[in-house]
Design a protein with these regions (language model features):
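Structural register within alpha-helical repeat arrays
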Residues: 196-198, 232-234
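Bacterial Sec-dependent N-terminal signal peptides
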Residues: 1-22
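Canonical positions in the second alpha-helix
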Residues: 217-218
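Structural motif corresponding to the intra-repeat A-B loop/turn of tetratricopeptide repeats
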Residues: 204-205, 239
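Long, contiguous interaction/recruitment modules in multidomain scaffold/adaptor proteins
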Residues: 74-187
């Protein structure tokens, strides 16, 4: 009995000692918050390295659901509704899964936020499935990377890259409808956003005469604001 207690104590001591030792994570976690449209998209995933291994078709098998990272499930959170693959996805937190293959991947947005292995995956929880052609890269990406690119007012792309393979997922948002609704609402109030509304009309190819009228109102309110005069001149040049 005494020997058993001593053994248990030794094991506990070693475990406690190891628990105090902090070392770098083999696949560190990254969280990204990207402003997009009128809100933001947040992404959380872990980043394994190539480390001399063969990645796709070996470490990551072809034709099987992949958590798209390491450790925990990869999640994506939309602050506002977006459209992916022609499907409207409501604001909220979702899982980001993929099924890699040699020439194309299936990218999945799922209600499941805890998938870490193919056995956990439930296809009926899918919201979106998009086929994305693979792109061969000249330079190797040692650390698994997901990033946003080509960010525009109402569209962006989510790039998934590792080793010498990349895929891209287009994302869009109906920004115009919401901005126009805001303008209509705020123009019926006392403190009207003449300059902001005029800029939106001018920058997005809308009614320039209306934009000019709003610039004129903005000048009346802030006659010494040189930037308003400058943008008003830009509007006149486009008429």
């Amino acid at each position: 009995m005494r020997k058993l207690l001593l053994t248990a104590f030794a094991v506990f001591t070693l475990f406690f000692a190891d628990a105090q030792l902090k070392t770098p994570a083999p696949s560190p976690t990254q969280s990204i918050k990207q402003d997009f449209g009128l809100s933001a998209i947040e992404l959380s995933y872990s980043r394994p390295g190539v480390k001399g291994r063969m990645i796709f078709g070996d470490l990551v098998p072809f034709g099987k659901v992949w958590r798209t990272g390491a450790n925990n499930a990869t999640t994506i959170t939309f602050g506002d509704a977006v459209t992916i693959g022609g499907v409207k996805v409501a604001a909220g937190k979702y899982g980001l899964l993929t099924i890699p293959d040699k020439k194309s991947w299936v990218i999945i947005i799922t209600k499941q936020t805890d998938v870490t292995s193919p056995a956990d995956y439930k296809a009926h929880q899918d919201l979106v499935r998009v086929e994305a052609k693979t792109m061969d890269m000249e330079d190797k990406i040692e650390t698994f990377t997901i990033q946003f690119s080509n960010i525009k007012p109402s569209s962006c792309e989510l790039h998934i890259m590792w080793d010498k393979t990349a895929v891209s997922l287009p994302i869009s948002a109906d920004v115009e409808t919401k901005v126009m609704a805001q303008i209509d609402q705020l123009m019926n109030k006392d403190n009207r956003p003449y300059f902001g509304a005029a800029m939106y009309y001018m920058d997005n190819g809308k009614d320039l005469n209306q934009a000019l009228a709003w610039f004129d109102k903005a000048v009346e309110m802030q006659s010494n604001a040189f930037w308003i005069h400058h943008q008003r001149a830009n509007c006149l040049a486009k008429l």
